[in-house]
């Protein structure tokens, strides 16, 4: 017996990384030694002091029961304290912070709180696929906002049609940016605040990569800007900063009304974050941060390896100041998909076609730096052998 899927599921595109995982599995089944530069999943272990904190709490029976759907007070306090130390932002942990099962979950659920069927959501293009996916599931209409090299991969707010802006309920932004590696200034965030005020839009800033930065650069928080808390919230997690992608601990912080609405939705959908994981996240946020510095130095070395290799082959790339991604144009004679397919077939190396992140990702590909350095070196040598000199 077959069943008719709901329109919201039929309208949902296949998740990009599920497709990449299938391609890798298919090639491995053929006996190919595949090197994946596709998915951004840290290859370094979670720091010992975080694991030890979890082991301690795991032995306490009370932690095996249902957690608070909003998050333990101690967890929300740790998030607020981290914001104060890192950004100088003072948050009320009871009203302005809610725990998430990783920031992806909150990003996907946010449109359900503020988007009715037919409402518009402004999503960056190229951008993290969950912005559009969550919008579609809520019945909203994703409106792509182009991120182009000519504008530093920042949205041109003035180019968004006024009629579209008036219909928009939510706007997603993401800096440091996945997939482009672009960064945003406080001045840009201030312009976003003004835009959101003018049109009554809720701004959702995805700050997942704020701690993965190089060369002395320290990315700002959207919440540092005057008025940001009136118009928006920020999503973050411990995943990238502390190599905890599998632990699933994140948060949303900022506008109290938006935080409350998201928490209310979640209380009807899930049972919160396992308390042991929350205690591990507290240890991460409150504990020593020298491991984060070492992590960034490792990614900086990998960044330089990839950028130098590609530039030797004919690219003209600048070194991104943040994230663990390299965003690069495809050579002449290819589109994003054909180039990724050719590299996989000839070199056994997986790169992500830019079109996986939206229409404006055409002509680009993304490389992730989250694999052991010796394998990254081998991947670069395979690209040398496969491509030789390239032109554009």
Swiss-Prot record:
Name positions with the PTM N6-(pyridoxal phosphate)lysine: 240
Domain of life of the native organism: Bacteria
GO molecular-function term, one example from the UniProt record: L,L-diaminopimelate aminotransferase activity
Q: Which amino acids does the record list as binding substrate? A: 15, 40, 104, 128, 178, 366
**Which reactions are catalysed by this chain?**
(2S,6S)-2,6-diaminopimelate + 2-oxoglutarate = (S)-2,3,4,5-tetrahydrodipicolinate + L-glutamate + H2O + H(+)
InterPro entries xrefs: Aminotransferase_I/II_large, DAP-NH2Trfase_DapL_Desulfo, DapL/ALD1, LL-DAP_aminotransferase, NHTrfase_class1_PyrdxlP-BS, PyrdxlP-dep_Trfase, PyrdxlP-dep_Trfase_major, PyrdxlP-dep_Trfase_small
Keywords, alphabetical: Aminotransferase, Pyridoxal phosphate, Transferase
A matching Pfam family: Aminotran_1_2
Task: Identify the metabolic or biological route this protein is part of.
Answer: Amino-acid biosynthesis; L-lysine biosynthesis via DAP pathway; LL-2,6-diaminopimelate from (S)-tetrahydrodipicolinate (aminotransferase route): step 1/1
Question: Which cofactors are named for this entry?
Answer: pyridoxal 5'-phosphate
Query: What EC number is given for this enzyme?
Result: 2.6.1.83
Q: Which SUPFAM superfamilies match?
A: PLP-dependent transferases
- For the ligand (pyridoxal 5'-phosphate), the binding residues are 103-104, 128, 178, 209, 237-239, 248
Q: Which PROSITE patterns match?
A: AA_TRANSFER_CLASS_1
Q: Name one GO biological process term.
A: lysine biosynthetic process via diaminopimelate, diaminopimelate-aminotransferase pathway
List, alphabetically, the HAMAP family matched.
DapL_aminotrans_1
Question: Assembly state and interactors?
Answer: Homodimer.
Function, as annotated, reads: Involved in the synthesis of meso-diaminopimelate (m-DAP or DL-DAP), required for both lysine and peptidoglycan biosynthesis. Catalyzes the direct conversion of tetrahydrodipicolinate to LL-diaminopimelate.
Q: Which family does it belong to?
A: Belongs to the class-I pyridoxal-phosphate-dependent aminotransferase family. LL-diaminopimelate aminotransferase subfamily.
Task: Please report the name of this protein according to its UniProt entry.
Answer: LL-diaminopimelate aminotransferase
């Amino acid at each position: 017996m077959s069943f008719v899927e709901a329109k919201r599921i039929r309208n949902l595109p296949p998740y990009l990384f599920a497709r990449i995982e299938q391609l890798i599995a298919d090639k491995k089944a053929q006996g190919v030694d595949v090197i994946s530069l596709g998915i951004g999943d840290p290859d370094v272990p979670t720091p010992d002091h975080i694991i030890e904190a979890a082991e301690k709490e795991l032995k306490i029976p009370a932690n095996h029961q249902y957690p608070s759907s909003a998050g333990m007070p101690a967890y929300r306090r740790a998030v607020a304290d981290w914001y104060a130390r890192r950004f100088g932002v003072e948050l009320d942990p009871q009203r302005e912070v809610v725990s998430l099962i990783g920031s992806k979950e909150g990003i996907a659920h946010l449109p359900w709180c503020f988007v009715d069927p037919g409402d518009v959501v402004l999503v960056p293009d190229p951008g993290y696929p969950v912005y559009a996916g969550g919008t579609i599931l809520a019945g909203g209409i994703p409106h792509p906002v182009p991120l182009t090299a000519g504008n530093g991969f920042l949205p041109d707010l003035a180019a968004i049609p006024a009629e579209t802006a008036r219909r928009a309920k939510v706007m997603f932004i993401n800096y440091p940016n996945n997939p482009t590696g672009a960064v945003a200034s406080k001045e840009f965030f201030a312009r976003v605040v003004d835009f959101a005020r003018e049109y009554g839009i809720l701004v959702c800033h995805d700050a997942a990569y704020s701690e993965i930065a190089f060369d002395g650069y320290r990315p700002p928080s959207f919440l540092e800007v005057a008025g940001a808390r009136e118009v928006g919230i920020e999503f973050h997690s411990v995943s990238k900063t502390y190599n905890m992608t599998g632990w699933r601990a994140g948060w949303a912080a900022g506008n109290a009304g938006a935080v409350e609405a998201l928490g209310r939705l979640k209380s009807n959908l899930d049972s919160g974050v396992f308390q042991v994981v929350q205690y591990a996240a507290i240890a991460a946020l409150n504990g020593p941060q020298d491991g984060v510095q070492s992590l960034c130095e490792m990614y900086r070395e990998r960044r330089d390896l990839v950028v130098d290799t590609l530039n030797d082959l004919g690219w003209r790339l600048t070194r991104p100041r943040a994230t663990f991604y390299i965003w690069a144009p495809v050579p002449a004679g290819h589109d994003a998909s054909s180039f990724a397919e050719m590299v996989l077939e000839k070199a056994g190396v997986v790169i992500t076609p830019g079109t996986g992140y939206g229409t404006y990702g055409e002509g680009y590909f993304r490389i992730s730096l989250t694999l052991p350095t010796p394998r990254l070196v081998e991947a670069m040598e395979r690209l040398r052998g496969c491509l030789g000199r390239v032109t554009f």
